[in-house]
């Protein structure tokens, strides 16, 4: 760096001497042109010039790279309905619906077999030898005959299905005082005593019997009922039996 500055000062000194020589020569006489001096040091760069006029539009560049995925736009309007698809498989069976309204009354049926429908009769034994409470239904649980199944051995009650005149009878073995009621009605609250049969004896076997004819309506119930005198037996050799049968059906029913 010092060498470069030394050369610069040398050149400046020579230029100065040349200038003085020329000035002196001109002042004395005009001589021939001197030798061109050494080029000066480059000056400081000038300020930027004014913007030039816009250039001609260049050709279209290559497509840029794909940008990032943008956010979802707003929901569009419904499209045009498509064509119907194929019929799908059959679904499972749905729940059972509510019962519909009753249909119209059907036509009158053919006449039935009078003989078959009017045969009503039953006989049943009591084989249970257990004490009875007052007002308890006396159950004759072993069926001998039960035409048309109007007698129910599980509760000892006869239910009328064919209105008409019926005959009911019982034969009861006992050892002591015995009174039984024969009752009728449609339900527990409407049961009424029709007749009471009694027999009195002490420490001896006896058989008590009784019977009655009743006009029954459909769904009326008939059964025997115990009282406070209830020495009824139901053992082998001392049976008790309850019987009933239809005498004449009610033709107007």
Swiss-Prot record:
The keyword Membrane does not apply. Residues 78-96 have a biased composition (Low complexity). Gene3D superfamilies: 2.60.120.40. Highest expression in thioglycolate-activated peritoneal macrophages. Also found in spleen, thymus and heart. Very weak expression liver, kidney, lung and intestine. Pfam families: C1q, Collagen. Residues 115-253 form the C1q domain. Residues 35-115 are annotated as: Disordered. InterPro entries: C1q_dom, Collagen, Collagen/C1q_domain, Tumour_necrosis_fac-like_dom. The modification 5-hydroxylysine is found at residues 57, 60, 75, 90, 96, 108. One of its GO terms (molecular function) is identical protein binding. The keyword Repeat applies. GO terms for cellular component: collagen trimer; complement component C1 complex; complement component C1q complex; extracellular region; extracellular space; extrinsic component of postsynaptic membrane; extrinsic component of presynaptic membrane; glutamatergic synapse. PANTHER family: COMPLEMENT C1Q SUBCOMPONENT SUBUNIT B, EMILIN ELASTIN MICROFIBRIL INTERFACE-LOCATED PROTEIN ELASTIN MICROFIBRIL INTERFACER. Core component of the complement C1 complex, a multiprotein complex that initiates the classical pathway of the complement system, a cascade of proteins that leads to phagocytosis and breakdown of pathogens and signaling that strengthens the adaptive immune system. Core component of the complement C1 complex, a calcium-dependent complex composed of 1 molecule of the C1Q subcomplex, 2 molecules of C1R and 2 molecules of C1S. The C1Q subcomplex is composed 18 subunits: 3 chains of C1QA, C1QB, and C1QC trimerize to form 6 collagen-like triple helices connected to six globular ligand-recognition modules (C1q domain). This is Complement C1q subcomponent subunit B. The gene is C1qb.
């Amino acid at each position: 760096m010092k060498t470069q500055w030394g050369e610069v000062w040398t050149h400046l000194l020579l230029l100065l001497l040349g200038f003085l020589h020329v000035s002196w020569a001109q002042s004395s006489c005009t001589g021939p042109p001197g030798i061109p001096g050494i080029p000066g040091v480059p000056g400081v760069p000038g300020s930027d010039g004014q913007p030039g006029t816009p250039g001609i539009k260049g050709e279209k560049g290559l497509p840029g790279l794909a940008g990032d995925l943008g956010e979802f736009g707003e929901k569009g309007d419904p499209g045009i309905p498509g064509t119907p698809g194929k019929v799908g498989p059959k679904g499972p069976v749905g729940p059972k619906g509510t019962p519909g309204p009753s249909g119209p009354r059907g036509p009158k049926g053919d006449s039935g077999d009078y003989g078959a429908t009017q045969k009503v009769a039953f006989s049943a034994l009591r084989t249970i030898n257990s004490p009875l409470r007052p007002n308890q239904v006396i159950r004759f649980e072993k069926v001998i005959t039960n035409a048309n199944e109007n007698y129910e051995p599980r509760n000892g009650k006869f239910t009328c299905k064919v209105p008409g005149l019926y005959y009911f009878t019982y034969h009861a073995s006992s050892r002591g005082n015995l009174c039984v009621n024969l009752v009728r009605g449609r339900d527990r609250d409407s049961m009424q005593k029709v007749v009471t049969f009694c027999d009195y004896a002490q420490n001896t076997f006896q058989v008590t019997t009784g019977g009655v004819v009743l006009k029954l309506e459909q769904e009326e119930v008939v059964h025997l009922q115990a009282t406070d005198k209830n020495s009824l037996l139901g053992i082998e050799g001392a049976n008790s039996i309850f019987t009933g049968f239809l005498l004449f059906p009610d033709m107007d029913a």
